[in-house]
Design a protein with these regions (language model features):
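ASCE P-loop NTPase helicase motor core
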Residues: 170-173, 179-406
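N-terminal pre-Walker A segment at the start of P-loop NTPase domains
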Residues: 152-166
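C-terminal accessory regions
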Residues: 527-541, 545-648
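Conserved helicase motor core of P-loop NTPases
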Residues: 316, 320-512, 518-521
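Intrinsically disordered, low-complexity N-terminal extensions of AAA+/P-loop NTPases
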Residues: 1-84
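Residue-level recognition of short, solvent-exposed, well-ordered loop/turn junctions
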Residues: 304, 507-508, 524, 579
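Interdomain "pre-motor" coupling segment immediately N-terminal to P-loop NTPase/helicase cores
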Residues: 85-147
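Single conserved hydrophobic/aromatic residue that forms the stacking wall/gate
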Residues: 647-656
């Protein structure tokens, strides 16, 4: 790589040139400088690859996979200028040779950089990934040997209608009952919550039959997801066909993962860890696709060896905002099943179901993790909203003809609106709503008529927060004319022009979202609040004062002074990432005027599946923008899938 350009530059000049062209960040250059200080003889190639590895983390990757990445064209979603290409290393074999012979690189984590096959890690990311893989392996080796007859009788009671067709909810409960970890994945409407409630009934009833009582903790990554699960679990527990004592022993309160692990202000560490584990026999985590590698490592570290972990989520949704795609990696082959014969026999014995169609093959072998993973395959909600379910499946299958057909076939629930950037159709849609899905005008009218009694304000606020979920505008982008920042500004200006909102920062009806955790207030990143008048005593007289109402996972309303909220933003529009864990009656997705690297199949699928009744696509460009997004899959570099399916083996003991 001794080009004329490079020979005239120092290694640092070359990195700075890449930074100035937005191919590296200041942080990436700083890491390379630090490594050069630690090892003055480090080569340019190794320093550059270290900087790129750091840069990859900003895009959600845990490592730099030298086998799958062509640096010149794929690291940044665009081709760098020709003069910059000369600064990049040559062939992958050359990179690997330089790394294998560098004192900065090892295979065991003793150096700042770790090379695992073709994957280059910063040491911390490698250590977290290894910790997660090892913890999963330990839980897979923890077997709960239940007599098949007892388990079968309990499953029959909880699933009395299981017939000739395989009941995958029943299969999921059976698999999760026999090991220290269970993974249940499925799309919206497949009954993930129903399954986990029956699993709780199954495990608690079996424990109480032995004069024990399981300590159960329920959690979700965000406050919104926790609140949704709290509501749905509370309703379904009462319908369980179990003894009253068992039903009373099943908790319905769901907390956030941060609260579960015990946040510590001004610290990235949690109160619960290996030396101070959670007091729980069973931990269930919903919306697990939102969990990044750091959080998963912290969760697993905080569990006692005997604690059973159940992960629940949709493997096809967007991966976590931070680095890693843990749920996607763990469930990568869930649609294939890959069940071994002993698992097939176990399900036949306990559920009476035949899952041999999902047996492993020589080309697709299944290891221990596959034996503890169940994919729910029946959409029970499709009768109520068939269009949304059909569109989601078509997007997930990357089937563009079926995507177009779904919009044509289900015009009552699916809509495509071509828009121009200079018209006001977007604002009109949001203000007026559609059908029985109320828009912003109705919301502001209700905000303008507060109750007269203080004791009525909590219920009023709860109703308004629910009304806020009637419709939600989403975008896959944060910046630019079609990103949430400018969309929120645009909608705010229109509300002001319509005399619905005054020209000031805080006003009744302004919805806001937390952009970072506030441990003192007990509010988490992603929590949504609504600015409302609240009747309070002031100078001995009742007065309406501006406050922000948040609904906590347990349903209580928390009123906060606007001045106490530092990290918030207006949220008439939110990113698709931030919408995860939420459900809206009517979801509207903005697509920009041209394809974008962030627009992927997973993003479109996640946006579609946020809608309960109605989905509207607002297209500022040609239909090809949607086509491009549906055909583009999200890929995150990591080694977890390889570790999970290559190195983990079935326990020597099994409860079959």
């Amino acid at each position: 790589m001794q080009t004329d350009l490079f020979s005239a530059l120092t290694w640092e000049d070359a990195l700075l040139m890449l930074r100035d062209n937005n191919l590296l960040r200041d942080l990436d250059v700083a890491i390379a400088r630090f490594l050069k200080q630690q090892c003055p003889q480090a080569s340019y190639e190794v320093l550059l690859l270290a900087a790129f590895t750091s840069n990859q983390q900003a895009s959600g990757h845990l490592c730099l996979d030298l086998k799958n990445w062509e640096l010149a064209t794929q690291l940044w979603g665009t081709s760098p200028p020709p003069e910059l290409v000369t600064l990049l290393p040559g062939k992958p074999d050359d990179w690997l040779y330089d790394l294998q012979h560098s004192p900065l690189v090892s295979q065991n984590g003793s150096t700042p950089l770790v090379l695992d096959g073709s994957r280059l890690y910063l040491r911390r990311n490698w250590a977290r990934e290894v910790a997660v893989a090892e913890a999963i392996g330990q839980r897979l080796a923890t077997v709960s040997p239940l007599p098949a007859e007892r388990l079968r009788d309990a499953l029959v009671r909880l699933f009395p209608n299981a017939g000739e067709q395989t009941d995958w909810q029943q299969v999921a409960c059976a698999l999760a009952s026999r090991s220290g970890i269970g993974i249940i994945t499925g799309g919206p409407g497949t009954g993930k919550t129903t399954t986990v409630v029956r699993l709780l009934g199954l495990l608690q009833s079996l424990a109480m039959a032995d004069n024990q009582r399981l300590r159960i903790r329920l959690a979700a990554p965000t406050g919104k997801a926790a609140a949704r699960l709290t509501e749905s679990i509370g309703e379904q527990v009462q319908q369980l066909d179990v003894d009253v004592a068992v039903r009373d022993a099943i908790p319905t309160d769901v907390t956030t993962l941060h609260r579960l692990l015990g946040t510590r202000p001004d610290s990235r560490h949690f109160r619960h860890h290996a030396d101070n584990p959670l007091h729980a026999d069973l931990v269930v985590v919903d919306e697990a696709s939102m969990i990044d590698m750091d959080m998963m490592a912290s969760l697993l570290e905080a569990l006692s060896p005997h604690t059973r972990l159940i992960l629940l989520g949709d493997k096809d949704q967007l991966a976590s905002v931070e680095a890693g795609a843990v749920m996607g990696d763990l469930c990568r082959h869930a649609h294939q099943g890959r069940y071994q014969q002993r698992t097939i026999d176990f399900i036949k014995d306990t559920c009476g179901a035949d899952i041999s169609d999902y047996q492993e093959t020589d080309q697709a072998p299944g290891n221990a993790l596959a034996q503890q993973t169940a994919m729910l395959r029946t959409n029970w909600r499709s009768k109520d909203s068939p269009g949304i379910g059909e569109l989601a499946r078509a997007v997930n299958d990357e089937n563009l003809p079926q995507v177009r057909k779904a919009f044509q076939k289900y015009g009552d629930s699916l809509h495509r609106h071509p828009l121009r950037s200079d018209d006001r159709q977007l604002e009109t849609l949001l203000l007026n709503g559609s059908g029985d899905h109320q828009g912003l005008r109705a919301l502001f009218q209700t905000v303008a008529t507060p109750p007269s009694q203080r004791q009525d304000f909590d219920a009023w606020a709860a109703g308004l927060l629910k009304q806020l979920t009637h419709q939600q505008l989403l975008s896959g982008l944060r910046s630019g004319p079609f990103g949430v920042e400018q969309l929120n500004q645009r909608i705010t200006r229109h509300l002001q022009q319509q005399d619905l909102a005054p020209e000031r920062e805080w006003y009744p009806g302004r919805p806001v979202m937390m952009t970072r955790n506030d441990y003192q207030l007990g509010l988490m990143n992603g929590d949504v609040g609504l600015t409302l008048p609240l009747l309070e005593e002031r100078n001995g007289k009742p007065e309406l004062l501006l406050r922000v109402a948040f609904q906590l996972p347990d349903g209580r309303i928390k009123w906060v002074l606007p001045s106490r909220l530092d990290g918030v933003e207006t949220v008439y529009a939110m990113t698709v990432h931030k919408s995860q864990g939420s459900e809206f009656r009517h979801t509207l997705l903005v697509l920009p005027d041209a394809p974008h690297p962030l627009l992927t199949r997973e993003l479109i699928y996640t946006a579609v599946t946020r809608a309960r009744d109605r989905f509207t696509l607002l297209e500022f460009g040609k239909p090809a923008v949607l086509d491009s997004a549906v055909k583009k899959r999200t890929w995150r570099a990591s080694g977890l899938a390889a570790v999970s399916y290559t190195h983990l083996t079935l326990p020597t003991k099994c409860s079959v």
